[in-house]
Regions:
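Glycine-/charge-enriched secondary-structure boundary and capping motifs
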Residues: 2-15, 32, 123-141, 154-159, ...
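Glycine-enriched loop-and-adjacent helix/strand subsegments that border the catalytic/binding cleft
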Residues: 24
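Glycine-rich phosphate/pyrophosphate-binding loop regions near the starts of catalytic domains
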Residues: 29, 33-192
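Short, acidic Gly/Pro/Ser/Thr-rich loop/turn segments
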Residues: 59-60, 72-75, 170-173, 194-196, ...
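Acidic-glycine-rich active-site phosphate/pyrophosphate-binding loop
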Residues: 63-65, 71-73, 177, 181, ...
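Short, acidic (Asp/Glu-rich) active-site segment that either coordinates a divalent metal cofactor
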Residues: 160, 173-221, 225
């Protein structure tokens, strides 16, 4: 026995939670910012199935492409809580272009991926404009991207953000760390804050242990705690590329998740370690506060956070003064933070200040 069919409303993609028109509005809001990133090598325009980039480059004799991908991680939760979306785009770009930079590569182009629960054109456009601004500062084209509206998978207002960067370097100028030996000098470039790593611990400290609001003003920071934590990750191509082009940089380290203890050994040859003086650069107030509020041990801080140094260049002792002058002449702050030594039981030895005695 069959029941009578009742009249049913015709379903649409929008009724299922995917608004194509909202996606088109987002593109209209962001397209000028995206086009402003284009380099002469970019072929085609927005809207193609793939981005096109010409590799005709007479300056590089043995071209090697270097790629990197990363996301912003749980820092996004703070951006969502504060309804502030104009800074995380830079975080996304920085996490990839800084990684390819340590190979000696000049960033060429970048692609972003945003997954949202409900597509809000203004929110997505704010994120992508941040991506575009960071691409311009890094000298790379925002060649393409994808915004995926995933109704029922993410909550309304929630989103995830990831990116993919590609750069180029001459094979003879690749920075691999293989030539690092005893007596080389570590030059550190300052960070802007927490950058994009350690935010699971940050949220545990701020929201759970301290029961703070992100809008709480903190005298030591000169701003709210949320504003400080959302300070975008620093982009290092502009300060570092002139050094890479004019000197022999033996190794570079992007201080990300794992801090000093995990990242520095990634570029060191067997048998080589480093000694670092943690008093060689000013420690940012945000790290002092996180340590105090969370009662976090100092070694754990340096294993989790950048502690004020976001990028390290390792150079021959004979080049260190000239590299420091090159940076100073361009008004780039830098600090001699340590040296390479014969490796002992610990590849990374921190000394000075809280590590003395």
């Amino acid at each position: 026995m069959h029941s009578k069919e009742t009249a049913k409303e015709s379903l649409t993609y929008a009724a299922a939670g995917v608004d194509i028109d909202a996606g088109n509005r987002a593109v209209e809001l962001m397209k000028d910012a995206v086009k402003a990133t284009y380099r002469p090598e970019v072929l085609g325009d927005l809207g193609g199935f793939g981005g096109l980039f010409s590799l005709v480059n007479s300056r590089i004799k043995k071209p090697v492409l270097v790629s990197g991908t990363d996301g912003v991680g749980t820092k996004l939760r703070l951006a969502i809580m504060m309804d502030k979306h104009d800074t995380v785009g830079q975080d996304c770009v920085a996490m990839s272009v800084n990684d390819i930079l340590v190979q000696g590569a000049e960033p060429l182009f970048f692609l972003d991926y945003i997954a949202v629960g409900k597509l809000e054109p203004e929110q997505v456009a704010a994120v992508v404009k941040g991506v575009a601004g960071a691409c311009r500062e890094s000298g790379c084209a925002l060649l393409g991207g994808e915004t995926a509206e995933m109704a029922g998978f993410y909550g309304d207002g929630d989103y995830d953000l990831a990116g993919f960067g590609v750069g180029i370097v001459d094979r003879d100028r690749l920075i691999t760390g293989e030539t690092i030996g005893e007596g080389d000098i570590l030059i550190g470039l300052p960070s802007t804050g927490v950058h994009s790593n350690g935010f699971s611990l940050v949220r545990k400290i701020i929201l759970d242990r301290m029961n703070m609001k992100l809008t709480d003003y903190i005298d030591e920071l000169g701003m709210s705690v949320g504003e400080s934590l959302l300070t975008p990750t620093r982009l290092y191509p502009r300060p570092c590329l002139p050094v890479i082009r004019n000197f022999t940089v033996k190794g570079m380290v992007h201080i990300t998740g794992g801090g000093f203890y995990e990242n520095i050994p990634r570029v060191l040859p067997d048998g080589i370690g480093v000694e670092i003086d943690v008093t060689a650069w000013p420690r940012l107030p945000v790290f002092e506060l996180l340590r105090k509020w969370g009662d976090v041990a100092w070694p754990e801080m340096y294993r989790t956070f950048n502690m004020g140094i976001g990028m390290i260049m390792i150079v021959d002792a004979g080049d260190a003064s000239a590299v420091m002058k090159n940076l100073a002449d361009r008004n780039e702050k830098a600090y001699v933070i340590g040296r390479t030594v014969k490796a002992g039981a610990d590849r990374v030895v921190l000394g000075g200040g809280v590590f003395n005695g």
